[in-house]
Each structure stands twice: as structure tokens, then as C-alpha cells.
């Protein structure tokens, strides 16, 4: 009998790809005789390269080598050579539908994600919201596998061993955590204004943390020229801070550092999910979006989510990319820096 070989497809975005990891890991552990190949963008390789013996990673650059219709046909020919027995589409967009259809016409079993868009639409509409927790992305991914005949029980702690990633692979400036220290990560940025705590207020969080806890070290996470400039200003002003982008190159090394943090402070953004993959507690800050949309980090606690629950307009967006109905972004602006600091301290003192 032919060994089952399952293709799992998820191309973007980073946070969504990260959320596949607990499900892929659980699948691999509970079905050790099944071969699993994850098809994604090249940057995602560190998520999967050491995940389980029966998991391998396939990179596909959709902007270069596999661009456009001709590129997708070339990608399909590459995939067919692997002799997959079934395809799990964790993305369900135009590109993946094309690939899925080709496999279906070739007689392969296929299944795709249900994103529950209607429920999210009712949750985020301006009036008469239906305020119900939507299925999480983790559950949605697991449902795809179940449709292919592989029900799983999600079980995952970290991509690293219990002691965390190997700090010796990082530059000396990171060092070794001393008994008196707490290591705090702060990732203050997000793709959209509705998901980002105001910069001046987040700097207050940094300043007050350094004043209250002089033995704590703060690692600032961000990418892109403008973000790094802001983080460098903070690092210059507050000696306990390090701009991670200046000293660590590559996602794998950032994940190693995250695995040794006591707490990560993040928006509803990719860094929440990256830290979750390392088993690190995340204090998440929510504005226009809401955990009920189903994107809370893996095994993160609702009590660690900082949000204003008295605003009837929340959530107004699934992704935080819509203009504020009120015009004042009260969902973020009305969160006090002290609330975030208190939430950080509650888990550490």
C-alpha cells in the first residue's frame, strides 16, 4: 500500500503561516506514518525545518520563479512529481484554488479551509453585532485535515526543546539571562493603524518599565527602515533596551531569542504568533480587531489581552484595515500605558 503523502498549502501572511505550525506538528505526531509536505513562501522555512521527522518544507517564490499563470503551471508540474495522495488547502485564494483544481482533476483528494467570513462579518458590522467567538484559525486548519480523513487533537508547546533555543547561536551582546533579570520583548508595530498602539504611548510603556525595573532587559522587535529608526531612538534613550534588528539577522535567530523571553508585548500581529510558537507568554494589545475573530496566539490567555471591552464599536474590522467610524481610534488611544505595564507585571512579580 502506498504511503500517504499530504500536501499542505499556505502562502501568506507570516502570522497565518505561523498558526499552521501547531496543527502540522500535531498531525505529524499523531500520524507518524504519513508524509507531510508544507508548501509556503521561502521565509517560512524556520517554522518547519525541525518540526517532525515526517514533515518537509517546500519553498515557492510566487513573485519570481512561480509568478503568474505560467509560473503556477510550472509549480504544479513540480508538485505532481512528488506523487501526493491528498491536498490540504489552508489558504483558499485564487492561486491555491488553481492548484487544488489541478489535483482534483488528477483524481486526488482535496479539501480547503472554511474561513467563516459570514460570522466575522456579523461580528464586525457597525450595528447589531453578533458577538460570538468565531472558530479559531487553528480549528479551521484542523477541520481541513479531518475532511481528508485525519482528525487530530491539537497538542503543541514550542518549536524548541523545553530549555528554549540555543543562545550560543546569537551574538555575545544578547548574553545569558541572569537570575535577577527578566527579559521582555516589545513589538510595537502592526500592518494597519487600527491594530497599533500609539507610538508615544508605547514609548511611555518602555520608559516606565525601565524606571520601575532597572534589572529588566527590553528587546525591541520591528523591521523596515522607519520602524528601526524609531526603535534605535528608544534604545539610545533607555540603556536597558536593544533594537533586535541591529544585532540579529534572520527569523530563526529572532525565534531563538523569543524562546527565552519572560513576556512578549505585541499587537494583533505576526510577532504575537511567532512568540506563541516558542511557548512564550504574550501580552497582546487589541484595538479595532478582537480575539473573537479567531486570531489569538496559540495557547495565549484571554486575561493577557489588553483591550477596551466597553466600546460598542469593537470590533470594526477583521484585519484592522478599515477607517475608524468614530474618527478617534478610542479603542487604542484610551488604553493607558499603566494597564499594559500592570498586565506585564501580573505574570512576572
Model-assigned labels for residue ranges:
Residues 1-349:
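Catalytic machinery of carbohydrate-active enzymes
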Amino acid at each position: 500500500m502506498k504511503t500517504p503523502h499530504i500536501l499542505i498549502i499556505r502562502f501568506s501572511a507570516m502570522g497565518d503561516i505561523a498558526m499552521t505550525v501547531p496543527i502540522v506538528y500535531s498531525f505529524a505526531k499523531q500520524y507518524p506514518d504519513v508524509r507531510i509536505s508544507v508548501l509556503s513562501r521561502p521565509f517560512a522555512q524556520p517554522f518547519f525545518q525541525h518540526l517532525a521527522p515526517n514533515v518537509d518544507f517546500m519553498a515557492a517564490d510566487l513573485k519570481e520563479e512561480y509568478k503568474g499563470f505560467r509560473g503556477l503551471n510550472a509549480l504544479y508540474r513540480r508538485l505532481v512529481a512528488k506523487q501526493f495522495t491528498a491536498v490540504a488547502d489552508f489558504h483558499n485564494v485564487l492561486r491555491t484554488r488553481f492548484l487544488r483544481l489541478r489535483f482534483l482533476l488528477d483524481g486526488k483528494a482535496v479539501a480547503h479551509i472554511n474561513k467563516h467570513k459570514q460570522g466575522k462579518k456579523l461580528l464586525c458590522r457597525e450595528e447589531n453585532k453578533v458577538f460570538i467567538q468565531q472558530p479559531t484559525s487553528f480549528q479551521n486548519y484542523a477541520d481541513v485535515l479531518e475532511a481528508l480523513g485525519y482528525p487530530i487533537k491539537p497538542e503543541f508547546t514550542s518549536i524548541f526543546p523545553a530549555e528554549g533555543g540555543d543562545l550560543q547561536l546569537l551574538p555575545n551582546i544578547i548574553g545569558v539571562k541572569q537570575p535577577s533579570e527578566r527579559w521582555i520583548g516589545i513589538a510595537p508595530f502592526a500592518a494597519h493603524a487600527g491594530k497599533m498602539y500609539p507610538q508615544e504611548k508605547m514609548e511611555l510603556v518602555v520608559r516606565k518599565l525601565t524606571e520601575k525595573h532597572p534589572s529588566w532587559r527590553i528587546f525591541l522587535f520591528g523591521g523596515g527602515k522607519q520602524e528601526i529608526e524609531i526603535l534605535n531612538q528608544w534604545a539610545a534613550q533607555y540603556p536597558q533596551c536593544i533594537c533586535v534588528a541591529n544585532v540579529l539577522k534572520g527569523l530563526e535567530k529572532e525565534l531563538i531569542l523569543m524562546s527565552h523571553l519572560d513576556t512578549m508585548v505585541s499587537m494583533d500581529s505576526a510577532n504575537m504568533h511567532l512568540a506563541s510558537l516558542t511557548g512564550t507568554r504574550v501580552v497582546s494589545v487589541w484595538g479595532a480587531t478582537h480575539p473573537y475573530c479567531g486570531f489569538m496566539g496559540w495557547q495565549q490567555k484571554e486575561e493577557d489581552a489588553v483591550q477596551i471591552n466597553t466600546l460598542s464599536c469593537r470590533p470594526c474590522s477583521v484585519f484592522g484595515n478599515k477607517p475608524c467610524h468614530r474618527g478617534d481610534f478610542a479603542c487604542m488611544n484610551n488604553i493607558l500605558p499603566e494597564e499594559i505595564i500592570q498586565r506585564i507585571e501580573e505574570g512576572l512579580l
